């Protein structure tokens, strides 16, 4: 049997507020989108006695043997949802790690979706929710890779056919540790996204919002602050925001030409930064 090929799209937080904390995790609300930057996953059943997981590509270095994919498969086996099947999985990594683009979580989400679609597993709604939480807090967002509002009570509302825009995604040579950034959160916001609507995805509305983790990451890493400032100066027709806990900074544009022009200027000034033009999907 040949491999099935899956595109695992990068997640972007168009806006994010930290609204509180329970015993283990911070509570957040977020307006989430996905962009045309993706990892490629090849998956097939194997006669091997163990799952075989491998990573290749530019961002495959330093991925631990215990990763989101191995975690997912272990959870499915512990819950006895997947029995008598082993898989060979190859992931070609195009999404940088420690960037706030959710690469690992989206890999797990897309494999989970594939296993359900191909009827290898048939979890109940409750089981699916539990699996996602056990693998990682972003995993549930990746099950449908569409514009989504995550409410502060962890409920998800998805929206179709929102207006698309262009994103210049920029990442310096360093990453941000999610744990370190969240551990520095001192203030919480009042929930603002508990009545989700499609209007929230309008360019003008998104411009007014922010990512409450950004100030922490920018104060820890002055280079990030400089990058954001440079992108903001480059065009008054965009808005610029960190995604997740960083270190990727995203400039959003309505026009591809403007996005491409800013990329050219940025690449000349910041030669050691990775940057990519993408479109929301």
Regions found by a protein language model. Give the residues of each.
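A generic local secondary-structure boundary/capping motif
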Residues: 30-32, 129, 139, 155-160
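Glycine/serine-rich anion-binding loops at beta->alpha junctions
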Residues: 90-117, 137, 239-253
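Conserved, helical-rich catalytic subdomain that frames metal- and/or nucleotide-binding sites
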Residues: 51-53, 144, 148-239, 252-272, ...
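Contiguous, small/hydrophobic- and glycine-enriched helical/loop subdomains that border
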Residues: 112-152
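ATP-binding N-lobe of GHMP and related small-molecule kinases
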Residues: 1-99, 116-127, 171
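Short beta-strand scaffold segments in enzyme catalytic cores
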Residues: 16, 39-43, 140-142, 148, ...
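Hydrophobic C-terminal alpha-helix "anchor/cap" residues
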Residues: 32-35, 132, 231, 266
């Amino acid at each position: 049997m040949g491999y099935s090929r899956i595109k695992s799209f990068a997640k972007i937080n168009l806006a994010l507020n930290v609204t509180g904390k329970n015993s283990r995790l911070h509570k957040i609300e977020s307006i989430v989108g996905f962009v045309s930057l993706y990892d490629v996953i090849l998956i097939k059943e194997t006669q091997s006695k163990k799952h075989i997981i491998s990573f290749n590509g530019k961002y495959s270095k330093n991925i631990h043997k215990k990763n989101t994919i191995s975690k997912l498969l272990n959870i499915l086996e512990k819950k006895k949802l997947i029995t008598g099947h082993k898989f060979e999985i190859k992931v070609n990594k195009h999404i940088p790690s420690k960037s706030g683009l959710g690469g690992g979580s989206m890999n797990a989400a897309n494999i989970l979706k594939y296993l359900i679609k191909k009827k290898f597993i048939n979890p109940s709604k409750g089981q699916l929710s539990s699996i996602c939480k056990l693998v990682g807090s972003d995993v549930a967002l990746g099950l449908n890779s569409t514009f989504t509002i995550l409410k502060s009570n962890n409920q998800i509302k998805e929206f179709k056919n929102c207006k698309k825009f262009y994103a210049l995604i920029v990442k310096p040579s360093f990453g941000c540790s999610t744990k370190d950034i969240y551990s520095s959160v001192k203030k919480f916001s009042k929930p603002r996204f508990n009545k989700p609507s499609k209007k929230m995805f309008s360019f003008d509305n998104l411009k007014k919002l922010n990512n409450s983790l950004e100030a922490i990451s920018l104060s820890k890493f002055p280079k990030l602050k400089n990058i954001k400032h440079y992108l903001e100066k480059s065009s008054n027709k965009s808005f610029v925001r960190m995604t997740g806990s960083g270190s990727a900074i995203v400039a959003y544009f309505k026009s591809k030409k403007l996005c491409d022009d800013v990329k050219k200027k940025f690449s000349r000034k910041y030669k050691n930064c990775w940057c990519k033009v993408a479109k929301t999907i």
